[in-house]
Amino acid sequence: MTQSTTSHYFVESPSTRALVLGAVGVVFGDIGTSPLYALKECFSKEHGIMFSPEAVLGVISMLFWAMIIVVSIKYVVFVMRADNDGEGGVLALMALVLRTVAPRSGRARVLMMLGIFGACMFYGDAVITPAISVLSAVEGLEIAAPQLSQFVIPITLMILAALFLIQRHGTATMGKLFGPIMTAWFLALGGLGILHLVQAPEILKAINPYYAITFLVEHALQAFIVLGSVFLVLTGAEALYVDMGHFGARPIRIGWFVLVMPCLMLNYFGQGAMLLHNPAGAENPFYLMVPDLLQIPMVLLATCATVIASQAVISGAFSLTSQAIQLGFLPRMRVRYTSAAEIGQIYLPVINWLLLVLVIGVVISFKKSENLAAAYGIAVTTTMVITTILAAVCMRSVWKWNPALVAVVGLAFIVVDLSFFAANLLKVAEGGWFPLLLGSAAFFLLMTWYSGRKLLRARSLEDGIPLEPFIAGLLAHPPHRVEGTAVFLTGNTESVPVSLLHNLKHNRVLHERVVFLTFVTRDIPYVDDDHRLSCKDVGGGVFILKSEYGFKETPDVQRVLDLADRKLGMHFELMETSFFIARESVIPSKLPGMPMWRESLFAWMHQNGAKPSDFFQIPANRVVELGTKVEI
């Protein structure tokens, strides 16, 4: 990261039009590809719906009002107001509401665990979205070219493998095409919808909520089951909030209301219109509404759109993991920047290959998009419920709304969310168990790391020596001073770094300038360079340098030293500076803390994390690592 964070997505602030186009290409990919499978799943034979014009009107009415209430009202109008210095998403919202509660209170722990669990469920989404999106697009070959049906899974696997293989090179160049391609996709959706709407305009009666309510009342059990499939039109709604920091709330709102929502509505109503005249089209309503001559081009366009939707989710997984590392919930991992122009363009090899294996496994195991649809909703509904809870806390604690108003708004949204959540629980046995298992495993790992780090800090403080009195005593009877600068990286400036104690014990020297450098992650996404550094002169050429970072930034030692030169007048010659880092070996023990098996898991995670020198981007030939053992 080599640029100011005051404009953290683009180097030059583009026009609103360019931001809207960018948002269309990135933010709406997931929700924009739902027409490929959502209505098809609603009329699945397994739901037992007696096909009739009333059933079509009822389902389309449910789709329409679900999108209005959940996306347009809940997310676009209310939730997107809950920004953390412009950033959105469940982790940013969690950090925002945690500022309003006592740090170590029970309420803070509950809110933290809710936020982390909601974030972890995104990993389930990150696995299923590429699989179901690309698979459903390629399944169009079964209609466009039936002789190629046997190649649907191999083609899907090749596309997905290629998508993950190019991640290491970055997608900044291709990203310029995302906006135009997705714009063409949405216009195609709208055009197809209009084509069938003019043939059966009576489908527009579904705008009246009477049809949704009547369907729910008269077909209670079947309607409740179908509700889980109706939710598929909402997958990707959370992305509007998550990507708010990249494009801003206004461009996303414009993109939604001007292009995306109208085109989606037209397409869903068009699919419904086709079903009124051709009930057999329920087998695959999206592709069967496409004229024969346009089948192959539509398969190609749909494949491009689903690849773009998958890319957005993969990038989201990288970003989420990076945030979790900065907030102290995951060990350090290698983070590579794939674009000099966009801070958001990062690549984490471990996450990339793990996602690739899981996505390929899911496609091979589930085989068809309708099988994956059962697994899709549960992860997204869980995150939505948690977002609603945290947003309600924000309304009361941050915005200071009247409790009665918070209760009315919060209750309205939570009832809708819980209805979808309950309907999706029915699908747990059919595949919903997979994202739940994946999210729960991620949550367990994150909480194990968080708890293990707390234990490690507690042990270090118990055995630690207060820093400033130690330095005062050391300077009173100084060891031999040598030329150059020693930078000791430490997580706690209150205690003497173990690396300094080892250096004094074995080398018996002290550099002419000693800097204790610590990185502190704030509960905001970005910290401006003017407020990043603070320095305390302890005397005798010894300094305590604190560098603050936001949870969406990655510390960079070279950048800190350059900033210290510009802002504080502390010049560092890199080739005359040695960086001392303590490499801790964690030893599980029977001391009070976590169960032994969980401490062993933490020790394994600690051992396999990226080296501090790699993570902090320190030249390898300037690093001195000193090992130490710590029992927890």
From Swiss-Prot:
It catalyses: K(+)(in) + H(+)(in) = K(+)(out) + H(+)(out). The chain crosses the membrane at residues 19-39, 59-79, 110-130, 146-166, 178-198, 213-233, 256-276, 298-318, 346-366, 373-393, 403-423, 428-448. The keyword Iron does not apply. Keywords: Cell inner membrane, Cell membrane, Ion transport, Membrane, Potassium, Potassium transport, Symport, Transmembrane, Transmembrane helix, Transport. GO terms for molecular function: potassium ion transmembrane transporter activity; symporter activity. It is a multi-pass membrane protein. It comes from the Bacteria. It holds the Pfam family K_trans_C. The keyword Manganese does not apply. One of its GO terms (cellular component) is plasma membrane. InterPro entries: K+_transporter (IPR003855), K_trans_C (IPR053952), K_trans_N (IPR053951), Kup (IPR023051). It is found in: Cell inner membrane. Belongs to the HAK/KUP transporter (TC 2.A.72) family. PANTHER family: LOW AFFINITY POTASSIUM TRANSPORT SYSTEM PROTEIN KUP, OSMOTIC STRESS POTASSIUM TRANSPORTER. Transport of potassium into the cell. Likely operates as a K(+):H(+) symporter. This is Probable potassium transport system protein Kup 1. It comes from Cupriavidus necator (strain ATCC 17699 / DSM 428 / KCTC 22496 / NCIMB 10442 / H16 / Stanier 337). The gene is kup1.
